[in-house]
Every structure is written in C-alpha cells, then in structure tokens.
Amino acid sequence: MIVVTGGAGFIGSNIVKGLNEAGEENIIVVDNLSNAEKHLNLNSLSIADYIDKDEYLQKLNKFQNVKAIFHQGACSSTTEQDGKYMMSNNYEYSKTLLNYCLENSIDFLYASSASVYGNGKAGFVEKREAEYPLNVYGFSKFAFDNYVRRVLPQVKSQVLGLRYFNVYGPQENHKGRMASVAFHLFHQLQETGKMRLFEGSGSFRRDFIHVADTVKINLHFYESKTSGIFNAGTGKARSFEDIATALQSLHGSGEIESIPFPEDLRGKYQEFTEAGLDKLRAAGYSKEFMSLEEGVQQYYEQLSATDGRFV
C-alpha cells in the first residue's frame, strides 16, 4: 500500500496518476476537501481509499503494510501570514509523519520547495548557506528540511525531499491565486484576448518545470531508494514574458499588458530561480526535461480540451 498526502491536490494527484500508470492502484489518498472542487482531481484516478488529513494522523497505526508515503500535502500559499497555522500544517504534521515512517521502516518522500532559497544570492544549491526564505511558507519548508538533515545520518529507510521549483501543468485549477503563471495567462487570453504581467516581468526569471517531470523525478527516487534533499527544477531560468509569448504564438493573437506589482508581495517575491542540478544528476537522474515551449504547448492543449483536468 502507498499513501499520497495531498493526493487530491496539484502535484499529489499527478503522482497518483503516475503510480496508476506504473500499475499501482492500492493507494490511499489523504487530503482536505474543504475546497470541494478538488474532488475533480480524483475522478479519473484509481485509489483504494480516501481519508481526511486530520483523521489520518489519529489512525496512523491502524494502516498495515504501508510501503511508502509520498507526502505532498501542505499549505502552499506563499502569501499566508498566519505563521502558527503554517508551522502546524507544514512543519509539525510533516514531523509526525516522518517519525512514524522511521519507526516503521516506511519510505518517506516529501515535497520541499525552492522557496527555501529566498533571493538566491548564494545560489540554488542544496546547502544550508544558500537558504534564507522570504516568507513563512518558505520558512516552514526550510525548518523541516533542517529537521530532516539532523535525522538523515541515522535513518534506515528512505527519506527523500524534493525542492520543487515553479511547477505548472494539469490539475491545478483549484489553486486560485497560487496557480501557475501559465494557468492564469491562458484564462486571461481566453476571456479578454489580453495577458497581464507584473511590471518588471521582463526581468523576472524562474525555473519553470512541467508537473510531468516532477512525477518522473519522484518515481525515479522511489525506485532507487536514495535518501537526501534534491532540487527538482530544469536548471534553466526563463522569463514570465517567455510564457506569454509562447501562449501568444499558440493562440494566434493576444496583447501583453503591464500591471502594477502587488504591494503584499514586495520583499517576499523571488525574482529569479534556477535549480542547480549537480546533486540530482549525481544521484542518477539523467532524463531530459521538457522545454518551456514544449510544456506550455502541451498544457495549452490540455486546458483547451479538458480545462486542464484528467478525464
């Protein structure tokens, strides 16, 4: 049996799909369906059971023969200001799951984030000196990564953290403001014929990775049983304008407008990210990543055909 927390969410549901395609259907999805729209992410997937995230913690020891937990569940809002909630949901919950896995020799693969790097002045490499998060979401991930670092030398089962960079692709419809730039620009283009970018977006560059590539990385490490903390990005920073231009080309038209930069993001916004891949490659992950143009085209076609959902 495999458990996927956040399995009704964006990356989690894509991991469930990847496991299904690999022949695995004995999967428990753990999530919070307060946002009822998320059930749509599960409609076409094969799972054995669903359980609420809070109820799951209360019943941990009742589940037998669990061989791995893909821990993808978290509050992923980079603008959330309730630090107590963030640390309870992202840090304490993760520690409880990790310690349960260590006590029961269950493989534990979890979602970290490139947000731990902050402005990236010290580079985007998996080293403590490169980490200085700009918001409490990033801090919650940073704190758990450092907790993991302290226990790694003693672990006997797999403990694997992946620092996701800017992930885009199907099944993110429920994320609202936190959905990818590609998602928002597509819908702006469809609704108004225009795409709105923050002032300065020509110089904002991020490492955009298609969700299908993050699934491949997860499944690679699930098979290899490697432990550690690794970047999950493409190693190539691209501008927000590059996404708009790609969509413009696919759509055949579309103006690009500048809008004021939101005040609530000032000082908390990563203007540049680019994953260092040396550690990932050294761990045996050799697959090539989708180019931005290829990924945006694939996503454009999915959004046009199915509103970006699995069917």
Segments predicted by a language model, with ranges:
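C-terminal substrate-binding subdomain of Rossmann-fold SDR/epimerase-dehydratase oxidoreductases
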Residues: 190-311
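NAD(P)H-binding glycine-rich loop region in Rossmannoid oxidoreductase-like domains
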Residues: 44, 53-89
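N-terminal Rossmann NAD(P)H-binding glycine-rich loop of SDR-like oxidoreductase domains
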Residues: 2-22
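NAD(P)-dependent short-chain dehydrogenase/reductase
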Residues: 122, 146-220, 246-248
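A short helix->loop->beta-strand "cap" motif at the edges of active sites that frequently abuts
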Residues: 24, 104-106
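Glycine-rich phosphate-binding loop and adjoining beta1-alpha1-beta2 segment
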Residues: 29-56
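Catalytic helix-loop patch of NAD(P)-dependent Rossmann-fold dehydrogenases
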Residues: 88, 92-96, 103, 116-161, ...
